[in-house]
Amino acid sequence: MSGIKLKKYCLALDLKDDAKIIESYKSYHQNVWPEINKSIKDSGIKEVEIYLTGNRLFMIIEADDSFSFDKKAIMDAENSKVQQWEKLMWTFQKGLPNTKKGTKWVLMNRIYNLNK
């Protein structure tokens, strides 16, 4: 991937604060459905990492210039397997306290960079 400049996006979301729910969510992410991984890659996303502390999730996305959240939303709306996955994941997730009801992953703003 040398020479390709990737853009980084960081997002946050909460899980329901229940140990069994959190373990189930982690288990699903050990075996993400192949169709979900394909849809992620097809959107221009090159790397995704999700971190967990307590019940707070932090996701880092690295994507090429073909990626946009609007394009991904359209692709997801047209993909029944992604819709099935999202519906299932929402049973484990809850929005951040500072968001409107039903809001899922929230884009975060970078406030510090060591090299800038």
Predicted regions located by residue number:
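Polybasic/polar functional segments that serve as interface/processing modules
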Residues: 1-7
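Active-site-flanking beta-strand signature of metal-NTP-handling nucleotidyl enzymes
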Residues: 8-14
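Beta-strand elements of well-folded, non-transmembrane domains
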Residues: 15-17, 65
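Short amphipathic alpha-helical segments
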Residues: 21-45
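Short, glycine- and small/hydrophobic-rich beta-strand elements in well-ordered beta-sheets
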Residues: 37-66
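An amphipathic, aromatic/His-enriched active-site/gating alpha helix that lines ligand/cofactor pockets
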Residues: 43, 64-104
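Charge-rich, low-complexity N-terminal segments
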Residues: 79, 115-116
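Eukaryote-biased recognition of C-terminal alpha-helical segments
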Residues: 106-112
